[in-house]
A protein has these predicted regions:
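A C-terminal junction/extension of Radical SAM enzymes
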Residues: 1-47, 85-86, 147-151
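C-terminal accessory region of radical SAM enzymes
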Residues: 1-13, 45-91
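Generic structural signal for secondary-structure transition and capping sites
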Residues: 29, 42, 74-75, 98
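Radical SAM enzyme core and accessory elements
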Residues: 36, 47-50, 56, 61, ...
Length: 151
């Protein structure tokens, strides 16, 4: 993740990593197709289905059109739930331009597609990585040139 964050910080461009977007890529930047033809918002959504919960099921290749998938309520709600500017704790976070949330992981861990505020494990990890990167960039004169070689 550090390399992805660095690219956003130093160039303003993103790798388009689905979980570090706002909104996330579930359903709009990626979909997961299962062997039985079922289509899910993402691979994480497919894994939730493997556990018996069809929460992130969008349709089936045998009867769903692309428009059906895009108009599916699950696709829309998953997208809406990952817009950082609308999430408490994310909307006013200094790091939100670099970050993203995964509604599927939020659902799997908390039974809600809406991420909890800053006590979320992934949030703590991302903030820790970003804290260290910015600290290095501000305190080490040659750091930017060295870190640019990572991207």
């Amino acid at each position: 993740h550090a390399r992805i964050f660095l690219k956003k910080i130093l160039t303003g461009y993103s790798e388009n990593y689905m979980e570090l977007r706002s909104p996330c890529g579930a359903g709009i930047g990626q979909m997961a197709y299962y062997y039985d033809g079922n289509i899910y918002t993402c691979d994480e959504g497919r894994m939730v289905a493997e556990m018996g919960d069809q929460m992130f099921h969008l349709g089936n290749v045998n009867y769903s059109t692309y428009d059906d998938l895009m108009e599916n309520r699950v696709c829309k709600v998953t997208c809406q739930a990952s817009v950082l500017e609308s999430l408490p704790g994310c909307c006013d976070c200094v790091y939100h331009p670099y970050c993203g949330v995964c509604p599927v992981i939020s659902y799997a861990s908390d039974n809600s597609i809406y991420a909890r505020e800053s006590n979320v494990y992934r949030c703590k990890i991302y903030k820790g990585i970003l804290d260290i990167l910015f600290e290095i960039l501000f305190e080490e004169p040659d750091a930017e040139d060295i870190l640019k070689t990572w991207i």
